[in-house]
């Protein structure tokens, strides 16, 4: 832990693709996060998605003007938030196996995302009660807000 982290009481971490594959159940073509560049305990997380023209959704959305589907931006937010939940589960040693996306509220799409963009998903925990977690999320490209939403997730024991 860095000196700054010790002084502020925060533990910043990252997760490369291998760690994400250990944390999240998602796989190609539905893994919407390439890397976690910052995790602050159970409070917030920043994930990135590098959007490429080779992704299967661009075959139909839209062939002559490829736009990354908004619903997949929300899924990227959910997966980024899921990394927080999964780290928490792992740290607690609980028998919880899955995190399920439950609700989307206050969702707005502001600008299109196209191949070549790098999306940064900024997720902040709003609340947690037992197995329910609530998050506020923003998706940004080059610092510009492209989508935002509030989502909730439930930790489910198998």
Curated annotation (Swiss-Prot):
It is found in: Cytoplasm. Disulfide bonds: none annotated. The lineage of its organism: Bacteria, Pseudomonadati, Pseudomonadota, Alphaproteobacteria, Hyphomicrobiales. The keyword Cytoplasm applies. It comes from the Bacteria. It comes from Methylobacterium radiotolerans (strain ATCC 27329 / DSM 1819 / JCM 2831 / NBRC 15690 / NCIMB 10815 / 0-1). GO terms for biological process: fatty acid biosynthetic process; lipid A biosynthetic process. Its EC number is 4.2.1.59. CDD domains: FabZ (cd01288). This is 3-hydroxyacyl-[acyl-carrier-protein] dehydratase FabZ. It is an enzyme of class 4 (lyase). Pfam families: FabA (PF07977). The active site is at residue 61.
């Amino acid at each position: 832990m860095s000196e700054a982290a010790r002084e502020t009481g925060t533990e910043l971490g990252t997760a490369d693709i291998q760690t994400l594959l250990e944390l999240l159940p998602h796989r190609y073509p539905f893994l919407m996060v390439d890397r976690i560049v910052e995790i602050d305990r159970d409070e917030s997380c920043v994930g990135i998605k590098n959007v490429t023209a080779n992704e299967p959704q661009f075959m139909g959305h839209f062939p002559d003007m490829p736009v990354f589907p908004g619903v997949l931006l929300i899924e990227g937010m959910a997966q980024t938030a899921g990394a927080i939940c999964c780290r928490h589960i792992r740290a607690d040693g609980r028998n919880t196996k899955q995190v399920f996306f439950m609700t989307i509220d206050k969702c707005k799409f502001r600008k299109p995302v196209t191949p070549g963009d790098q999306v940064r998903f900024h997720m902040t925990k709003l609340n947690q009660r037992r197995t329910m977690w609530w998050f506020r999320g923003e998706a940004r490209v080059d610092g510009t807000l492209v989508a935002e939403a509030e989502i909730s997730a439930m930790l489910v024991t198998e």
